[in-house]
Curated annotation (Swiss-Prot):
One of its GO terms (molecular function) is phosphopantetheine binding. This is Non-reducing polyketide synthase nscA. Residues 428-448, 1637-1719 are annotated as: Disordered. The modification O-(pantetheine 4'-phosphoryl)serine is found at residue 1754. Non-reducing polyketide synthase; part of the gene cluster that mediates the biosynthesis of neosartoricin, a prenylated anthracenone that exhibits T-cell antiproliferative activity, suggestive of a physiological role as an immunosuppressive agent. The non-reducing polyketide synthase nscA probably synthesizes and cyclizes the decaketide backbone. The hydrolase nscB then mediates the product release through hydrolysis followed by spontaneous decarboxylation. The prenyltransferase nscD catalyzes the addition of the dimethylallyl group to the aromatic C5.
Length: 1794
């Protein structure tokens, strides 16, 4: 910009005509950029000063000022209203003018150019205060500092003037504004003054209320005074009344009133400036007084502000004098050149001044500089001035949402198709049959059956996340899926912790919203175990993510009810803006299992009873619950761009507030919502009319829809200013599709908004099922706002960004809003990719996952055949976390890669032979090749591609040149021909290359364990190991080469590589007369069968001929001299002399010495004489490597990297050890990058993960992060079902009242009483249902006798026949209550499961109560039963049953038909068995012998011994049975009769030689059915037949059918009776005499432990009816049980499949038997305990498996150490699991010390 001859800077007293809000928004936005640092400082200081001044106001005035984070947001409200209007207007004008001035200089990047010799400042009224700040400044930084104080004075002046003025005339009562000044035109100043003087004299108004002239010029006069006085004055004076006059926008009082203000007033206003601005600060630029037209006389800041204050309060403005002053300044400037006017837009006053200049100086050039126009400019990518100024980028997302939306793409498909995921509560959550009552009469039952649920909530890859199955099962599914989606979101983001500064683990935090604890409170609480706290407490959801990924940033779990998910995102954003983290993972979690929450929300009238959320529908009646898990990865925009991330959208602002003024805590509040929107808009500096999409909270409630529609329309589509037709605002509400995810609702809405940005489409709204709700504002269409009722394109305008808002409100009153904009448009750098070969790596933590990952990638490639291989390589290598199971390849094209992938998948051995990388990374040895590998261009591609390598080479080359040697770069980059080169150039270029390569390998993250150099290569090895410096190495190599050239003759000697050992060569040469006298020397022992010899050319030629005649391969080396021979003798002394001054240091990396044949660690072994000897003596490569092997420095896993132009040393290593892993750095006739790719893949597969980020860094901005398929999880279902109806049962205990103590006196008569059924406690009979609760005492004589009739381990143990009789008894009783006319009742006792053995107490006189609960439903002809232990002291019933079954009432004719079809088969097997007995092939047992065999496990009382004779063959048997004649009590079917006809199965399992009865015993957990065609007869004769077989799907389990025959007819059957094999050593544990406290203990240990037993589901409580959910889609909803005055126990459901840890007596242990091999020794027993307690298979406990990988953490370590002590008698500390981190180390310790 040319410097003007003179200039005036004009500070007006009016705002520009631009959109004032827009100007301040733009100022605010620019201030966040580092380019505008001083603008940012000025605005921050001005904001701070205004806040300080407001805080000093009286309370009633403070309340008039809205909250503001920056002064730039104050224009968003009508700041001119109220008593502070003048103060705000004055301050904002000062801020705007000074902010625009500062911003102009920073935007244009120009120096401060206001020269006092040619610049004058001028202005009017408040504008003079802005001018004062410039007048006192010598730099732009001064303007920022002093300007803030000018803002203070402006504000104080406005406050003071308004305060004084209201004392002169009160404001209007209706709040309307009245002007305190009018401008009159067409009259002179004198004429106006005369009229006013006359008026003031006639009316005799007090002096201070008079009307006066405040400003005048040639054409106009400003008349000022109290509004009523002005009105009266104009009415009094005909001249004024008929003059041309207009009111001015002066609404807050009087200035320029000498009659009103005194020096004291001026001091009060100006005094504040003195405290900050030194009064001695000099005035640097002249500032014209608007009263005198001359510069203020002040010399210092204090004087200047006082003079300005005096003028503003008491002086009259004379525009003509101001113009004259400016003209005088113009006149003083040089007559040639331009005169510049600097202003803030144009005004009428300024136009007049310009006209005057043009008139008086027509020959003068004129220039204008506008200080406002810059604010509309685009200054490139914003560089935030602070963390708080950053925009935030969302770079990854993942989800598990209803309707199978298990990833974002599936979620989008659901939205695009307009699907509704409504369904009923799945059975795995809770049983609607028992927990649903639409009438609301059943306490704690849900009144709605609807919801939206995710698929397979229990499925989880526990091994991936280092969790044991036991821990996984106890861990809340929400927490598990938080882990999973966090990983998937990171995967989408290409986030590798530690890859970049923004992803350092200590700078990564997690923020998740969670509002319920269903799993902890319901499912996991049924068996509170080791992992109850870490598995269920909310904080662990985040803590587990941080711990697993090793993030040490902040970890917050947030509960703000329904807005928790989005509030977590907002908190995460706040952490980024505060600098507490650099990357955050945020989300929301909700998995529904607890019917209590359904009941609570229903009773609170939150939930719809009719189905899905009907957002904006007139019939909206509440929300529908939904599961949901969502995670996003967020970082600052500048970090995301630097990290080459894919940016899904950008967060401009996020805020949360509370509806404190709502009518109730749960009622929304439009005012609070609007305030929150405005705060977000202010934070971002965004015009609400620029927002084109709002994702509503939209729950579908009458209140919620009404309030949100009002708040959104008022802020984003107000009536005025109204949106244009092309500015339509679209609305959406995802809850219409997938319900209300509660804590996950906000994150779900955010995910939808991100997809809308990605897909450029707004999916259709499906929430209006009937018609739009009439409560919605009627004029929305006129405001150009509405729901997208069809899939609506949402294109991104060219060169612009779309804006969207996401809302989420909490039921507790919280409101969270996030403002989003488009990601920056990315222009991909398009350059030629010189990398012809790319590494491709894929990994997983299991073979199954790896194979699936490869299959997914192959499928993706098939669908994307044009994918860029470089992008794919970059994504898979640099932007993926790598795991232990690995696949890798170096590919030259997509087609070649596809072929490789298919080949791997088609090769079954590939997966079978795959092994995880070792926990300990292999050692790495660098081998440095000698000069024989030299060729031109040996590092060409590396030099061109990698700046790090290039820098290393250039620096080393510079050193070489400074040492006086030629440049080696032309050799390395191939710019010279590949012809003969001097020894100096050859040897230096090889050395430079090798040192640079070694450092490059380190740069790629490869840690070097040792180095070895071959001949010349030793110098590079020494430099890399730190023995000598790189400079010293180059100096020695160069000088040695020069000495060789000077003192040795090229071609006189040569070197020969011979494929034979040294001894073989000597024998052949010595044995031939032609060669015996020839002299040669051994130069190198490269391998046992590879030797290099040297000597004179003649001798070597002859020796070669002799050797080749003996078919020995020989190769003449292309070297000019014979190193390591006598030819080197002339240089040795000089070489040693050159090396003597060098200080040789101890190596930082061990050196393998081919000269010494040892490993060098010290500083004394390598010295000048070493170099002399190494030049002359043999290179014994073999000895060096063998020494390293002996020392343990290298082993079979060691990776050998050949560092040289060609892998010569690599072939030598292979010659010594054929199994060695060797890789190359460079290879002759192969592109360096192809070689490097292959080598890096080899290292990666060996477990030495390269620093892929560095490998791709040179071209990172050219590559794109691809959106590849997600990780393939190796999932198992970890789900603890909710068992029973205890959430309903607890309603029986009102307000903490205890149940009455259990009465066991049996004094009250009972309608039903037998030997086992003692007292009815509850009985409810309806038309088609009946419920019965029975109390019995197992210590009752009849019951106790039945127990002792079946003794195990000297204990009376309840046999299944006891539960069968009780079931038949209750079943017939209840059936006859409902069907009194029934003649015979035929019952099928089905699905009997006994989970805990009932052992008789030993103590006589004790009480051992149990409760039987039964519910019969005639509509299903079934009755569900469950047995519970009860407390003898309190009567409290255990939470979980110990046995369950279902009795089905069936037609016996069907049984007969079934059995008739089978009878010939059964009879045929009986006949075959009896024939085998005749033939002596089967055992025929008498009664005594049979029951003697039975004593192996069970000792039966005589009445139970009904089998007279048994024929037994392996697992098949038939028995003759005679029942005892006595019933011995009151029964339906005596247990001893049932046992007699059925316990043949037990004899087969526990007495057959086909069973291992020495080590095991067999017990039954139940059967699938038990039917009797007719009642058993006293003394009756029967036959029993059974054949048992192992169950293939369940280890250690056997099953069979027991047929009961009377004659030739089948009259009964026990179907699918099961027996489990249990180690005999556990007999004492499971069947020990019970203590008196046994029942109380069982009440606490009620978890089932019959592992892997599939539980059957009881029949529904009532017949279903059809309830419409959506058109054409009826859903069966069961009716609830009717409520009675006496609350009946709800129907029973079967118990959980979960295993108990084994503390309580059980029928089947939670262990897996692997045969005798694992029983032997302490180690085997310990492994069994580990397997049982963790839920792992013993096979998984391999020696190399680490406890971390197995999920054995500190808690499990404590458990295992206690189990070892209690069960095995082994005392070990839990810390042993840290000291011995793998199974192998642990077993070694156990073998050594136990």
């Amino acid at each position: 910009m040319a410097t003007p001859r003179g200039q005036t800077v004009w500070f007006g007293n009016e705002f520009p005509n631009d959109d004032l809000k827009d100007l301040f928004r733009r100022l605010h936005q620019h201030s966040k950029d580092r380019r505008f640092r001083l603008l940012s400082v000025f605005l921050e200081e001005s904001t701070a000063i205004l806040k300080e001044e407001v805080a000093n106001l009286p309370q009633q005035l403070q309340e008039l000022v809205p909250h503001f984070d920056t002064a730039c947001t104050l224009p968003e409200v009508d700041f001119r209203q109220g008593p502070l209007g003048a103060a705000m207007e004055s301050a904002l004008l000062t801020i705007l003018e000074l902010g625009m001035l500062i911003g102009h200089y920073e935007a244009e990047d120009i120096e401060w150019d206001l020269d006092p010799s040619r610049t004058i400042l001028a202005g009017l009224s408040i504008g003079i205060l802005a001018g004062a700040a410039v007048a006192l400044s010598s730099s732009l930084a001064d303007v920022a500092k002093v300007g803030a104080e000018s803002v203070r004075v402006s504000f104080r002046l406005g406050v003071y003037v308004a305060d004084i003025s209201t004392k002169l005339e009160a404001p209007q009562s209706d709040g309307t504004l009245q002007s305190w000044a009018h401008v009159v035109t067409g009259m002179s100043h004198e004429a106006v003054q005369e009229e006013l003087s006359q008026y003031n004299a006639v009316t005799q108004n007090p002096e201070i209320t008079k009307v006066f002239v405040s400003a005048a010029d040639k054409t106009s006069v400003s008349v000022t005074g109290p509004p009523s006085r002005i009105k009266a004055a104009f009415q009094h004076s005909p001249s004024l009344r008929y003059s041309k006059s207009l009111p001015l926008p002066v609404y807050d009082g009087l200035c320029h009133a000498a009659h009103l203000y005194s020096q004291d007033d001026i001091e009060i206003v100006i005094n504040s400036a003195k405290s900050v601005i030194p009064t001695s600060r000099p005035v640097r630029l002249p500032l014209i007084s608007s009263q005198t037209g001359k510069p203020f006389a002040a010399k210092t800041a204090g004087e200047l502000f006082l003079e300005i204050g005096t003028e503003l309060l008491t002086g009259t403005i004379f525009l003509d004098t101001v113009t004259a002053g400016i003209l005088e300044h113009v006149k003083l400037q040089e007559p040639t050149g331009n005169y510049e006017i600097v202003s803030f837009r144009m005004s009428q006053v300024l136009n007049g001044i310009l006209t005057a200049i043009e008139t008086d100086f027509p020959e003068l050039g004129r220039a204008r500089r506008d200080m406002v126009s810059w604010v509309h400019g685009d200054y490139g990518a914003r560089r935030p001035s602070s963390y708080a100024a950053s925009k935030l980028a969302i770079v990854g997302m993942a989800c598990r949402l209803p309707g199978g939306a298990n990833d974002p793409e599936l979620f989008w498909e659901l939205l695009e198709q307009g699907r509704d995921t409504l369904t009923t509560v799945p059975p795995d959550r809770f049983d609607l049959n028992t927990h649903y009552d639409p009438t609301g009469k059943t306490e704690n039952a849900t009144q709605t059956p609807f919801g939206n649920f995710i698929d397979r909530p229990g499925y989880f890859d526990a091994g991936f996340f280092n969790m044991s199955p036991r821990e996984a099962e106890q861990t809340d599914p929400m927490h598990r899926l938080a882990l999973v989606t966090a990983y998937e979101a990171m995967e989408m983001a290409g986030m590798v912790p530690g890859r970049t500064p923004s992803t350092r683990p200590n700078r990564i935090g997690t923020f998740y919203g969670q509002a319920s604890d269903d799993w902890r409170e319901l499912n996991a609480s049924q068996n509170i175990s080791t992992y109850a706290v870490p598995g269920g407490e909310r904080a662990f959801a985040n803590g587990r993510i941080n711990y697993f990924f090793k993030f040490s940033g902040p970890s917050y779990n947030i509960d703000t009810a329904c807005s928790s998910g989005l509030a977590a995102v907002q908190a995460a954003c706040s952490a980024l803006w505060a600098g507490e983290a650099d990357t955050v993972i945020a989300g929301g979690l909700n998995v529904i299992t607890d019917p209590d929450n359904y009941a609570g929300l229903g009773n609170g009238h939150f939930l719809s009873k009719t189905g899905q959320c009907k957002v904006w529908d007139k019939d909206a009646d509440g929300y529908c619950r939904a599961d949901g898990i969502g995670s996003v990865v967020i970082k600052r925009l500048e970090d995301a761009e630097a990290d080459n991330d894919n940016i899904l959208a950008v967060i401009l602002g996020a805020r949360t507030n509370h509806s404190a003024e709502a009518v109730s805590i749960t009622h929304p509040h439009a005012g609070a919502q609007k305030a929150n929107y405005r705060q977000v808009l202010h934070q971002a500096g965004v015009n609400p009319l620029d927002v084109s999409y709002v994702e509503l909270h939209g729950t579908g409630t009458q209140a919620g829809d009404a309030v949100e529609s009002e708040s959104v329309s008022d802020v984003f589509a107000p009536s005025t200013p109204r949106r244009r037709p092309d500015q339509r605002l679209y609305l959406g509400a995802v809850k219409s599709n997938i319900g209300h995810g509660e804590a996950a609702a906000g994150i779900t809405s955010l995910l939808k908004a991100l997809l809308v940005f990605q897909k450029n489409m707004i999916p259709k709204h499906i929430g209006i099922k009937t018609e739009i709700n009439p409560i919605i504002p009627k004029d929305l269409e006129r405001r150009h706002v509405g729901l997208a009722m069809e899939n609506t394109p949402w294109p991104r305008p060219a060169g612009k960004k779309r804006l969207a808002v996401v809302n989420s409100f909490g039921a507790h009153g919280g409101n969270t809003t996030v403002l989003l904009e488009d990601a920056p448009e990315r222009v991909k750098v398009s350059t030629q990719d010189d990398r012809t070969t790319h590494p491709v790596v894929i990994s997983a933590k299991s073979k199954k996952s790896l194979q699936a990952n490869i299959e997914k990638l192959l499928s993706w490639l098939d669908q994307n055949p044009d994918a860029n291989l470089g992008d794919l390589s970059y994504t898979l290598c640099a932007r993926r976390m790598h795991h232990s199971m690995r696949f890798g390849a170096a590919a030259s094209g997509i087609a070649a890669l596809q072929k490789t992938l298919r080949s791997w998948l088609d090769n079954p051995k590939a997966s079978a032979e795959l092994r995880a990388i070792p926990n300990d990374t292999p050692s790495v040895v660098l081998t440095f090749t000698g000069q024989g590998a030299y060729y031109s261009g040996m590092g060409r591609e590396l030099l061109a591609e990698f700046s790090y390598f290039r820098t290393e080479v250039f620096q080393l080359d510079q050193i070489a040149q400074r040492l006086g040697f030629p440049s080696v770069v032309p050799v390395i980059d191939g710019s010279i021909d590949d012809g003969p080169a001097s020894p100096v150039l050859t040897q230096l270029s090889v050395t430079v290359l090798e040192i640079a390569l070694a450092r490059f390998w380190s740069h790629l993250g490869i840690r070097i364990s040792a180095v070895i150099g071959h001949s010349l290569g030793e110098y590079a090895a020494f430099a890399v190991a730190g023995v000598i410096s790189a400079t010293e190495a180059l100096y020695l190599v160069g000088r040695r080469a020069q000495l060789t050239e000077e003192r040795c003759t090229q071609g006189s000697h040569s070197m020969l590589s011979v494929r034979a050992s040294e001894d073989d060569i000597e024998e052949l040469i010595a044995g031939s007369p032609d060669t015996a006298e020839l002299a040669y020397e051994v130069c190198c022992r490269n391998t046992p069968q590879d030797t290099v010899i040297g000597g004179t050319q003649e001798s070597i030629d002859s020796i070669r001929q002799a050797l080749e005649k003996n078919t020995i391969k020989c190769t003449q080396l292309d070297v000019p001299f014979a190193f390591h021979t006598a030819q080197m003798d002339p240089i040795l002394d000089s070489l040693e002399t050159l090396a003597t001054p060098i200080t040789f240091k101890a190596p930082s990396i061990p050196v393998l010495s081919p000269l010494l044949g040892s490993v060098v660690f010290d500083r004394k072994s390598i010295h000048a004489q070493y170099l002399r000897r190494a030049t002359r003596e043999t290179v014994d490569f073999v000895a060096a490597i063998e020494a390293a092997q002996d020392f343990g420095l290298v082993d079979a896993k060691t990776i050998w990297i050949d560092v040289g132009p060609h892998p010569i040393c690599a072939s030598l290593v292979r010659g010594i050890d054929s199994s060695a892993s060797v890789i190359s750095s460079c290879r002759r006739n192969e592109d360096n990058l192809a070689t490097m790719s292959k080598s890096l893949v080899t290292l990666h597969l060996a477990g030495l993960t390269p620093c892929w980020a560095e490998y791709f860094r040179p071209r990172e901005q050219e590559y794109s992060l691809l959106k590849l398929p997600t990780y393939s999880w190796n999932e198992t279902d970890y789900w603890i079902p909710y068992i029973g109806t205890w959430t309903l049962d607890k309603a029986l205990l009102k307000y903490g009242e205890k149940k009455a103590p259990l009465s066991l006196s049996m004094s009250r008569p009972s309608a039903l009483r037998t030997s086992l059924v003692h007292q009815i406690t509850t009985e409810t009979v309806e038309a088609t249902t009946a419920t019965l609760h029975v109390l019995s005492d197992m210590q009752h004589p009849d019951f106790l006798e039945a127990l002792h009739g079946h003794r195990m381990n000297n204990c009376g143990v309840a046999t299944s026949s006891i539960w069968s009789d009780m079931a038949f008894t209750v079943g017939e009783y209840l059936y006859r209550r409902l069907v009194p006319q029934a003649k015979d009742v035929h019952m099928n006792l089905s699905d009997l499961e006994v989970l805990h053995a009932q052992v008789a107490l030993e103590k006589k006189g004790s009480v051992q109560p149990l409760v039987l609960k039964a519910h019969l439903n005639l509509s299903t002809s079934s009755m569900s039963l469950a047995w519970f232990n009860a407390s003898a002291e309190t009567g409290e019933c255990a939470a979980e049953s110990f046995a369950t079954c279902v009795v089905r009432f069936e037609d016996p004719a069907a049984w007969t038909r079934e059995w008739d079809r089978l009878s010939h088969l059964v009879l045929g097997r009986i006949e075959a068995l009896e024939q085998r007995a005749v033939e002596g092939k089967a055992s025929k047992l008498s009664k005594p012998l049979a029951y003697t065999l039975f004593k192996n496990v069970v000792d039966y009382a005589d009445r139970y011994r009904g089998m007279d004779q048994v024929v037994l063959y392996e697992h098949e048997a038939v028995a003759e049975v005679t029942l005892v004649a006595e019933r011995h009590g009151t029964w339906h079917t005596p247990p001893h009769w049932i046992d007699s006809v059925s316990h043949l199965a037990g004899l087969v399992m526990n007495g057959s030689n086909a069973s291992n009865t020495r080590d095991y015993f067999y017990v039954t957990p139940g059967c699938s059915s038990f039917r009797l065609l007719n009642p058993l007869k006293a003394g009756g004769k029967y036959r029993s037949y059974v054949r048992m077989f192992p169950l293939p799907e369940e280890a250690n389990m056997y099953a069979g059918d027991v047929y009961i025959l009377e004659g030739e007819q089948i009259v009964g059957m026990v179907g699918h009776i099961r027996f489990r094999r249990v180690p005999r050593l556990l007999m004492d544990r499971f069947f020990s005499p019970a203590a008196a406290s046994h029942t109380e203990k069982q009440l606490q240990e009620t978890a089932p432990s019959a592992t892997n037993v599939k539980k059957s589901t009881p029949p529904p409580a009532e017949a279903p009816i059809s309830v419409p959910v959506a058109p054409g889609n009826p859903v069966a909803i069961p009716l609830p049980t009717a409520s009675k005055s006496q609350v009946a126990t709800p129907p029973l459901t079967p118990p959980s499949q979960e295993d108990s840890p084994g503390e309580s007596a059980v029928i089947t242990p939670a262990t897996s038997d692997r045969g005798d091999s694992t029983d032997a020794g302490v180690v085997g027993q310990c492994l069994k305990v580990m397997a049982r307690e963790t839920g792992l298979e013993v096979d998984a406990l391999t020696p190399d498996a680490s406890f971390v990988q197995l999920g054995i953490d500190s808690l499990m370590s404590l458990v295992l150490s206690e189990k070892f002590r209690a069960e095995l008698g082994i005392e070990i500390k839990s810390s042993l699991f840290l000291e011995c981190p793998t199974i192998g180390e642990m077993t070694a310790w156990l073998e050594e010390y136990c």
